[in-house]
Amino acid sequence: MCNESLSHAVTARSVRVVAAWLFLLEGEKIDMFDAIIIGGGVTGCAIARELSRYQLDICLLEREEDVCCGTSKANSAIVHAGFDAKPGSKKAYFNVEGSRMMESLCRELDISYDRCGSLVLCFDEADLPQLEQQLQRGKENGVDGLEIVRGEKLREMEPCVSPNAVAALWAPTGAIICPFGLTYALAENAGDNGVQFRFDTCVERIERTESGFAVHTNGGVLESRTVINAAGVYADELHNQLCENKLRITPRRGEYCLLDKKDGKLARHTIFQLPSALGKGVLVTPTVHGNLLVGPTAAAQDDKEFTATTAAGLASLTAAAGLSVPNLPMRDVITSFSGLRAHITEGADDFVIGESAEGFFEAAGIESPGLTSAPAIGAYLAQLVAEKLNAVQKTDFISTRRAIAPVKELPFDERCALIESDAAYGQVICRCEQITEGEIVEAIRRGARSLDGVKRRVRAGMGRCQGGFCAPRVMEIISRELGVAQTDLTKSGGDSRLLVGHTKEVR
């Protein structure tokens, strides 16, 4: 592509995305909607994208300052094959369907996807029947290509695996993905197709009206013909306002460690251990960005906000991961984090997906394999809502979306042409990840308003120094692009301000 045409393409795309995201932030002032979606995680955004195929007025409400601020930002980043879920369950169905949909969805939305496959390790001959049970479950669920591997074949596939592993269940359809990239892509595509997004909007209560529902928020009352509950760990509280059968969600906190990219080749596949009652256990997996991810732990708690990491949790994580891959270089950990899984402890033992009350649809209790299931859940619920509203499909639905150009991955001639069209793409701001000013500006134009919003969109601050070098420059760029004082900028919205004032003014 010539420099002139490349420049035109970049400019045109930027204008389109800027317009779309401003629409997302401000929205047309409609207070009566056909559908209100509550929750801007990957499930809510998948529902929004699928529902935007129809001629409907749709609004997604998110209590944080951006999408992808809850469980969707802190999980294992893997596409489960579907062998673990109980046959006949909703978890099994939506897992397998979501896994089948994911690769083509990633192509449409320009998201990184790597079908690296997964291995479930068995360390004792006495546990082989449990491994066989996983194999049979997978076959019943319709998972393709499953087999049990042993000995030399296992070690050829995964050279660093523990010598104590006697066998493994091989699932070639397992994959890895970027959960941030997926969530943002779904949201952007939904916005391109007319969905409104209202951020910093907390739902306080929902009431029935003659025309549907009144959704009371901290920013006023919105009316809608239907409501879709995708509120993560808070989904039970919304459910219990409108449904006779009550749910209780008890979050499970999972801690993770992320290792430096130099260790990313220590695992070629996602490596599990045999699951327990608490979940699929601690895994070791490569990421689509080249790091090594270890986790999660599983600790039940009543607090729906507590996401701290603990010394005890990280110690148990290290010990458990070492059973799969001995001598992991934990000194190379560049960050640790935790996320909450929305585990239902009362009222259901499966995903709650469907029309739970007249006009009230939901995806509740979406724990693992929720990321994998999101595309299938979105398609299913969108169809139910559309049928309820007698909605007509659009003829001009936009099915594709372009990712922000990853400058460091472009061929040399394309990189040169991009820099010639916009010099900002030649200014490296984040040295660890080699992220340019042009990429950061594009992230802001697509909705980033905080350091974490930029970080998750383009990885500035995601590398070895975790923003120690680039954070001040990123803040300068955000301040310049949004016209906001640096003292008003936050790490992740709310009260997470990074600066308290100017040096000579603070006493």
Predicted regions mapped to residue ranges:
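Short beta-strand to alpha-helix junction loop
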Residues: 93-96, 124-130, 170-188, 307-312, ...
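Glycine-rich FAD pyrophosphate-binding loop
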Residues: 53-72
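Active-site substrate-recognition segment that forms the wall
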Residues: 46-50, 79, 111-114, 231-359, ...
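Short hydrophobic core segments
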Residues: 36-38, 222-234, 378
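Helical element adjacent to the flavin cofactor pocket in flavoenzyme catalytic cores
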Residues: 173-225
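C-terminal catalytic lobe of FAD-dependent flavoproteins
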Residues: 288, 305-428, 435-443, 452-453, ...
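N-terminal Rossmann-like FAD-binding beta1-loop-alpha1 element of flavoenzymes
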Residues: 35-59
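Dinucleotide-binding Rossmann-like beta1-alpha1 core, especially the glycine-rich loop
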Residues: 77-157, 281-282
